[in-house]
């Protein structure tokens, strides 16, 4: 019998990054897939709209990552219809017959869900004290961020990071007026 594969360890960390600069863009276009004959989608939208904001700052918490620059691209494109309206029951894992799967824990049946890994990824830039990341959020979230950016100072980026093996996921991201390390 082959040895069982070890599950990668999962670690969580809260990052606090005082915002030092930002750049924003708003896009509108004819959907590039509407004219692309190589790709066929059932019913693509004709127009494509998006808003993105790039947030930059130097991490000040936790101490072992203090002084490292972070650049996070927050994209407000809704790729799939209703992607951000999904409910946990929509992600219930099903067997080959389409029946929901449950695990028994102490005699109680607990549903098994296929939860997304995160909103986006964070990667270390090799050889530098710099990190880059991206995440997908609803267009409304990016619009709300753009309302805060020119009017409120100081602002902080709070990232709840989820590390699975060597991959770092953005589990949660917020732009806030209070320092996340002191909450």
Predicted segments, located by residue:
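Aromatic-residue detector
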Residues: 1, 155, 173-177
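Low-complexity, intrinsically disordered/propeptide-like segments
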Residues: 22, 122-124, 178
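Short acidic, glycine/tyrosine-flanked loop/strand segments centered on an H-E-D-like triad
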Residues: 82-132
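Weak global preference for isoleucine
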Residues: 17, 46, 72, 101, ...
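Acidic, glycine-rich flexible loop segments
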Residues: 111-156, 160-167
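OB-fold ssDNA-binding interfaces and closely related basic DNA-contact patches used
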Residues: 1-104
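OB-fold/S1-family single-stranded nucleic acid-binding modules
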Residues: 162-183
């Amino acid at each position: 019998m082959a040895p069982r594969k070890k599950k990668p360890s999962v670690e969580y960390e809260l990052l606090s990054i005082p915002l030092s600069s930002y750049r924003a863009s708003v896009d509108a276009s004819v959907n590039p897939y509407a004219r692309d004959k190589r790709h066929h989608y059932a019913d693509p939208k004709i127009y494509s709209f998006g808003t993105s904001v790039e947030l930059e700052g130097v991490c000040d918490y936790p101490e072992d990552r203090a002084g490292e620059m972070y650049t996070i691209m927050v994209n407000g494109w809704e790729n799939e219809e209703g992607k951000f309206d999904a409910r946990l029951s929509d992600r219930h894992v099903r067997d080959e017959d389409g029946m929901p799967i449950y695990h028994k824990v102490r005699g109680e049946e607990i549903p098994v869900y296929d939860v997304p890994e995160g909103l986006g990824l964070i990667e270390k830039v090799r050889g530098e004290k710099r990190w880059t990341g991206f995440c997908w959020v609803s267009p409304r979230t990016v619009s709300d961020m753009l309302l805060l950016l020119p009017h409120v100072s100081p602002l902080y980026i709070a990232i709840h990071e989820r590390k699975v093996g060597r991959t770092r996921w953005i589990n949660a991201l917020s732009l806030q007026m209070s320092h996340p390390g002191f909450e």
